[in-house]
Amino acid sequence: MYQLRDVKLSRNTRTLLQIDELTLPAHGLTVVLGHNGSGKSTLLKMLAGQLKPDQGQVLFNHHLVHAFAPRELAKHIAYMPQQIPQPALMQVRELVELGRFAWRGWLQRWQSDDRQAIAQSMDDTDVAHLAQHALDEISGGERQRAWLAMLLAQNAKMLLLDEPSSALDLAHQYQLMNLLRAQVAKQSCAVIAILHDLNLALRYADRIIALQRGTIWFDGTPVNLLTHPALSDLYGIDLDILPREGKHAVAVVA
């Protein structure tokens, strides 16, 4: 579980993020929305221990995130950045195997649970057939799925994903979201994902947090977001709510 208290981060007099109080539970799928530059990636980097606030505290399970040793933190938190590295000549399977480093280190032998975690995560993300391919010879979407496989192999109880569907085709976007929902249910874990697709957020999220200019503009359920009187203000464009078979979709009004 995360707790943020009086958190503020600024750069050159510009406030990137300012959150008085925020609690993120240890279970469920939380989607973070907001326009470009609203502070979404900054928030995720802070949760992952990649950024330290100028003031305030970011606590994970009642301990300061930046006080964890990297390997110990990796047992609890798996993080996919927005710009994923592309190591030259590394094969997909080798990348996925890195997910087990927190548990085995570099020198220990693989155990059966390591091999099982690696194989299962590659099957779940549809990259098993790419195991021997180099990362720089597969597509951006395939590379994104390979990174997700590494995170799943890590077996952390908190997944932090910065735009995990940005390079995926439509079918794999929904496959990804179904997989994340299944992980939450099966592993009793938590997922915090940044998305730009409002419809995906409304369909799959348990909770939505929307940022605007570095502050929390909305925090609640998808249903509550749909009825928010200023929903169009979130992206600065007219939106229309379309009811469909007991659910809702959002359309841009031309």
Descriptions of predicted regions:
Residues 33-35:
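The feature captures the beta-strand-to-loop junction immediately N-terminal to the Walker
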Residues 48:
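Helix-to-loop junction immediately C-terminal to a conserved catalytic motif
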Residues 56-64, 73:
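Conserved ABC transporter NBD signature motif
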Residues 109, 134-138, 142:
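Conserved ABC ATPase signature
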Residues 159-163:
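Catalytic Walker B motif of ABC-type/P-loop ATPase nucleotide-binding domains
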Residues 213-214:
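Conserved ABC ATPase "signature" C-loop
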Residues 234-254:
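ABC ATPase nucleotide-binding domains
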